[in-house]
Amino acid sequence: MIMDFYKKSKTEINMEKFNEIIASDKPVLVDFYATWCGPCKMMHPVLEDVAKIVGDNARVIKIDIDKNEELSRVYQVRSVPTLMIFKNGELKWRTSGVTPAATLEEELKKHY
């Protein structure tokens, strides 16, 4: 399951579909999270704000690690939340833990 803040939708995800999403020429912020994770719950409104601010300049999505174990393994997600920015299929930035909206906006803008 993937939650897309820009499209305001939830859809099933697999490795092929994920690779299509991150191949975008616009930056894609990916939040690897878990439903049982307190800090992940704190990030949800932050990500909503970031998605509104960046608009269609970037995409903000969430990936549930418990429902997408293959993606979690491939991208070596060891703690949640783990946030990554991809552009043209390449990992451009990565961090773990609660991250302020200003930091996420700044990192996304580097890749517009």
Please tell me what each predicted stretch does.
Residues 1-29, 34-59, 67-74, 78-82, ...:
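Proteins that catalyze or organize thiol-disulfide redox chemistry
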Residues 62:
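Conserved residues in the N-terminal Rossmann fold of short-chain dehydrogenase/reductase
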